[in-house]
Design a protein with these regions (language model features):
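Active-site and NAD+-binding cores of ADP-ribose-processing enzymes
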Residues: 35-143
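Long, hydrophobic N-terminal alpha-helical segment
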Residues: 1-43
């Protein structure tokens, strides 16, 4: 990812992963800036990632985030940038800003264990137009 994201500053190599296919879809949809369903790609790709048994996955401590963390990109970026710089783990479990009690994972492709994280499968999924009736109304995709 080249642009800044919720958990990192611009220019830092990082890969965002979702805990579940449904949350991955929500993460894609929330970032789309397309005014009409017909402008969407026919499908998105869902990648399943596998890790070797000894790859360390850190969890973000509960007290690391303040009550308004969803609106404080400076704070979440500082946390992610510090984790990337620390090289403590190849993966960091972080909360989803979209859905309570759901996690996302940050993957540091520059970590020494990065080669022990691999793509297990790739599947193409079509966008279901019913999603856009809910999101934007009348077949229009919205934010």
């Amino acid at each position: 990812m080249r642009a800044a994201g919720r958990w990192h500053s611009a220019g830092r190599p990082i890969v965002y992963l979702a805990e579940h296919p449904a949350s991955a879809l929500l993460e894609v949809l929330v970032h789309l800036d397309i005014g009409d369903v017909s402008a969407l790609p026919m499908a998105y790709q869902l990648l399943e990632v596998a890790t070797a048994a000894k790859v360390v996955v850190l969890g973000l401590p509960a007290n690391a985030l303040n009550a308004s963390w969803r609106d404080d990109l400076g704070a979440t970026r500082a946390i992610g940038d510090a984790w990337l710089a620390s090289t403590q783990s190849a993966l960091l479990r972080v909360p989803s800003a979209l859905v309570p009690n759901v996690a996302n994972y940050l993957f540091n492709p520059l970590h020494a264990d990065a080669s022990r994280v691999s793509i297990k499968s790739v599947a193409r999924y079509p966008f279901d137009n019913r999603l856009f009736k809910v999101v934007g109304g009348g077949g229009k995709a919205g934010r």
